[in-house]
UniProtKB/Swiss-Prot annotation:
Record GO biological process: adenine salvage; AMP salvage; purine ribonucleoside salvage
Protein's UniProt name: Adenine phosphoribosyltransferase
NCBIfam families the record matches: apt, PRK02304.1-3, PRK02304.1-5
Compartments (UniProt record): Cytoplasm
Enzyme Commission code: 2.4.2.7
Broad enzyme group: transferase
Gene3D superfamilies registered for this protein in UniProt: 3.40.50.2020
């Protein structure tokens, strides 16, 4: 583990048996509340793209809004919120995506991304990859070029990274936690 990964993982609270027995919930609110760790995480998410023309950062509800907004600011890019169905006020495009126990839908405004725009997808964590896969499909449906998908936390045992890589998406993460 790198020094940066060690610093960031120390700022993330682990809550056993939440939301159900056998699951360890990785809570980034402690990282967000620590100014040094929050800045370090944003700087590390931004660093690979410094000097690269990125048009939009797409953040997934809800923690992806916090991280994605900060990354968009640093890269002088626009921000696109990807939300659960029914939460956006203007005309939207929608896609169904798989959850661990079923299917849900996410959407974004129809005019949020233009064909050919370079987009980075940002969220706090990738687990099974179902939500991120849905966001990738939604962005591609609108003609976006997905430069990368970036996450603070990867739970590699759950296969989300591979799911996105199989779609041809570059995946970048800052910290890995084994198990669930």
């Amino acid at each position: 583990m790198t020094v940066i990964a060690s610093e960031l993982s120390a700022a993330i609270r682990s809550i056993p048996d939440y939301p159900k027995p056998g699951i360890i919930f990785r809570d980034i609110t402690t990282l967000l509340g620590n100014p040094r760790a929050f800045r370090r995480a944003v700087d590390e998410l931004v660093q690979p793209y410094a000097g690269t023309k990125i048009d939009k950062i797409a953040g997934m509800e809800a923690r992806g809004f916090i991280l994605g907004g900060a990354v968009a600011h640093q890269l002088s890019a626009g921000f696109v919120p990807i939300r659960k169905k029914g939460k956006l006020p203007h005309t939207t495009v929608r896609v169904a995506y798989s959850l661990e126990y079923g299917v849900d839908e996410m959407e974004m405004h129809v005019d949020a991304v233009q064909p050919g725009e370079k987009v980075i997808l940002v969220d706090d964590l990738i687990a099974t990859g179902g939500t991120a896969e849905g966001a990738v499909k939604l962005l591609r449906q609108m003609g976006a070029e997905i430069v990368s998908a970036c996450f603070v936390i990867d739970l590699p045992d759950l296969g989300g990274r591979k799911k996105l890589e199989d779609l041809g998406v570059d995946v970048r993460t800052l910290v890995e936690f084994s198990g669930h």
